[in-house]
Regions:
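Flexible hinge/switch segments at interdomain interfaces of large molecular machines
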Residues: 94, 98, 165-171
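Short hydrophobic alpha-helical membrane-entry/anchor segments
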Residues: 159-165
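Peri-catalytic and regulatory segments of divalent metal-dependent proteins
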Residues: 2-159, 178-184, 191-235, 239, ...
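Active-site-adjacent, His/Asp/Glu-enriched structural segments that form or flank metal-binding
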Residues: 171-173, 187-191
Length: 245
């Protein structure tokens, strides 16, 4: 898992989030860059050129597919990073971060059997970014104090950890409440499914991968008692989402 980051590093030098408005592209990118810098320094960050090339060969067609479908504006494509960060963690997890960063754990890569299954998860996370779900979720909290904004950043990082790691990083009821605000709404999850499905098809991947990956996650949801599938905590499966597929 990603190593625990000191609380003090999360609150210093944060971009201004405005007053009650969604975060601007510039502010979201700066926030994402700061989080990425912390993750790059983490000992569990994995720099593997071969694996990165494999992931890029999936990621880049998805980004182009989103652009072709009109989901990704030229401004957003230019100003966001569109980079992948790989974690050594064996838990099954992937997560979108502000500013166009995508985090993927080795555990997720190890359970997929096809590129199409992995593409389905990456397309879903990409759609959270293109639809500005992070900005919309955090914009609702723009009046919070800098300390709580820092807690939100730690909450994002904790999403890449086990439940125990998240508990260690986020302390106090207010901070836990801040973390909960980062969970995408049910409508956002379904929107990311729908748009991600289309993007995946546009990029030339077999959309059956979406269905088979959902099946794996559904099976894991019924069997998971060890916390090794944190993706299911941040992306709970519902009968509606399954029916949409």
């Amino acid at each position: 898992m990603w190593s625990q980051l000191p609380t003090s590093t999360a609150t210093g030098g944060l971009p201004a989030l405005g007053d009650g408005a969604d975060i601007t592209l510039s502010a979201e990118r700066k926030l994402g860059d700061r989080i990425a810098r912390e993750l790059y320094r983490d000992p569990d960050y994995l720099e593997d050129p071969v694996l990165d090339e494999y992931l890029q060969n999936i990621w880049q067609p998805l980004v182009k597919g989103a652009q072709a479908r009109g989901e990704l504006s030229p401004e957003l494509q230019e100003r966001f990073a569109w980079k992948i960060l790989i974690g050594r963690d064996r838990s099954v997890n992937a997560f979108a971060l502000p500013g166009g960063y995508l985090g993927i754990h080795l555990g997720l890569i190890s359970v997929v059997t096809t590129r199409d299954e992995l593409a389905s998860v990456m397309a879903h996370e990409l759609s959270h970014v293109t639809q500005r779900h992070i900005s919309r979720s955090m914009g609702d909290q723009a009046r919070m104090t800098p300390w709580l904004i820092g807690a939100m950043i730690l909450g994002m990082l904790a999403a890449s950890k086990s439940a125990q790691g998240a508990q260690a990083m986020i302390v106090g009821g207010q901070a836990m409440a801040a973390q909960s605000q980062l969970n995408f709404s049910r409508d956002m999850e379904r929107e990311a499914d729908r748009i991600g499905y289309g993007v995946m098809s546009e990029a030339g991947f077999d959309t059956l991968g979406f269905v088979t990956m959902f099946g794996k996650l559904q099976q894991a949801a019924g069997l998971n008692d060890s916390g090794s599938f944190p993706y299911l905590r941040s992306h709970p499966l519902s009968s509606e989402r399954m029916a949409d597929m």
